[in-house]
Amino acid sequence: MIGSHDLRGLRERLPMSGSAGGRWLLLLALSAAATAVLADPAPEAVDPCATFNSDVRHERALFAGQAQPLAAAKAAAGAPAVTPEHLYQLQLHQRAEVTFAAPPAQRHPPPAAGYAGLVTLEVNAAGLYRVALNQALWIDVVAKGVSIQSSDFEGRRGCAAPHKIVEFMLPANTPLTLQFSGGITPTLTLAVTRAPAAAAPH
């Protein structure tokens, strides 16, 4: 890119005679340099959804599809089931109306005015799974009344498709409760996926 110091250097290198020809050459050179400055393309904006450290192409493809509406439950009993590799749009409830299967594990409790809800999940094969969300709420995966510690998480400001991905090592053929808390809107887009082999611990 040509800057102002380049223009000054160009002016110094050209002959500065008082003749009309010298002045004309100087004007032509400066005009060409200024045109080059104006024509220099601006840097392209970076898509925040493309800046995840891990490979999230599969989750992004799911979030580009049509979400299935589903009402989350206010308690674990009778909570609807979600299936891996499907996209859901959950309808959440006021936090005060929800009874959790286990106390949310976050350090600071969600505000009473936030949104919350529960669904169930069961996977056929044990391994590392991802829970992808379109907002920065808190998620717990509960098995037999105990929260499963997350293995990793990642989020990107400015990206909602997905905004946040949390990874958990899940047991096979075990009823699990996914509980959400601290939502800022009453709807939550959600997908559960199997983590790529490269992401799984060796």
Give residue spans per PLM region:
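Bacterial N-terminal signal peptides that target proteins for export
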Residues: 4-25
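Non-catalytic extracellular/lumenal accessory regions of secreted precursors
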Residues: 42-113, 199-202
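Extended extracellular/luminal ectodomain segments enriched in beta-structured repeat modules
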Residues: 123-130
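Noncatalytic modules at the cell exterior or secretory-pathway interfaces
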Residues: 129, 169-182
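Short, surface-exposed beta-strand/strand-loop-strand elements in extracellular ectodomains
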Residues: 136-150
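Beta-sandwich interaction modules
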Residues: 160-171
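Edge beta-strands of jelly-roll/beta-sandwich modules across compartments, strongly enriched
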Residues: 184-195
